[in-house]
From Swiss-Prot:
Enzyme Commission number(s) of this protein: 3.1.2.22
InterPro entries (alphabetical): AB_hydrolase_fold, LYPA1-2/EST-like, PLipase/COase/thioEstase
UniProt record similarity statement: Belongs to the AB hydrolase superfamily. AB hydrolase 2 family.
Gene3D superfamilies: alpha/beta hydrolase (3.40.50.1820)
GO cellular component: cytosol
Positions carrying N-acetylalanine: A2
UniProt GO BP: negative regulation of cGAS/STING signaling pathway
Subcellular location: Cytoplasm, Cytosol
Protein name: Lysophospholipase-like protein 1
Keyword match Cytoplasm: yes
Catalytic site: S124, D179, H211
Entry keyword Magnesium: no
GO molecular-function terms, A-Z: carboxylic ester hydrolase activity; palmitoyl-(protein) hydrolase activity
């Protein structure tokens, strides 16, 4: 697996309606797929998430053994020792996937999309993966979003940011206060740690929302995406 590249990733792609000038990489949660995430978003919004100028890439994590499932095989971006914020990260698996997803970013750059026109984000584990990818390896992307996600207390992301002195991508973070799988307090802690390390970020909290996507959340995410990746008309205003 050490030599894995983006070629191992199945991907679901939603093409822009007009000229492609920006790209969005949207990472699913544990046990899901790129196609599954796209269909879930479509169900919540009652329509596909689409843009005039932004290509959306929904990759699928390659199947691997997952410790919280007693070693069962699942589509996960990395392994966890357990689902909590106070245990060590499984850095070996995180770093392998950072390289695989870096290859995916490089593919977009080779096709003519600048790094500052690429956004990375995800739901749950996908959001955690996006934060590792952007803040440890790609601090020149347009922005990062994390929906119902968290970082472990001693995360390698925090260690990387302590050594950083450049401009960091903004983080858009959302979390349901009723989430019982990934606690809202873990998201608050992640947000305050990143803020203290120089990341511009706001945590949007949603009362009565569990570990799920909500329409309100996706509506404000879409607006934020357009502020980070404006089309030609928006840039001229």
């Amino acid at each position: 697996m050490a030599a894995a590249s983006a070629s191992v990733l199945q991907r679901c792609i939603v093409s822009p309606a007009g000229r492609h000038s920006a790209s969005l990489i949207f990472l699913h949660g544990s046990g899901d797929s790129g196609q599954g995430l796209r269909m879930w978003i479509k169900q919540v919004l009652n329509q596909d998430l689409t843009f005039q100028h932004i290509k959306i890439i929904y990759p699928t994590a390659p199947p691997r053994s997952y410790t919280p499932m007693k070693g069962g095989i699942s589509n996960v971006w990395f392994d966890r020792f357990k689902i909590t914020n106070d245990c060590p990260e499984h850095l070996e698996s995180i770093d392998v996937m950072c390289q695989v997803l870096t290859d995916l970013i490089d593919e977009e750059v080779k096709s003519g999309i600048k790094k500052n026109r690429i956004l990375i984000g995800g739901f749950s584990m996908g959001g955690s993966m996006a934060m590792h990818l952007a803040y440890r390896n790609h601090q020149d992307v347009a922005g990062v979003f994390a929906l119902s996600s968290f970082l472990n207390k001693a995360s390698a992301v925090y260690q990387a940011l302590q050594k950083s002195n450049g401009v960091l991508p903004e983080l858009f973070q959302c979390h349901g206060t009723a989430d019982e799988l990934v606690l809202h307090s873990w998201a608050e802690e992640t947000n305050s740690m990143l803020k203290s390390l120089g990341v511009t970020t706001k945590l949007h909290s949603f009362p009565d929302v569990y570990h799920e996507l909500s329409k309100t959340e996706l509506d404000i995410l879409k607006l934020w995406i357009l502020t980070k990746l404006p089309g030609e008309m928006e840039k001229q205003k």
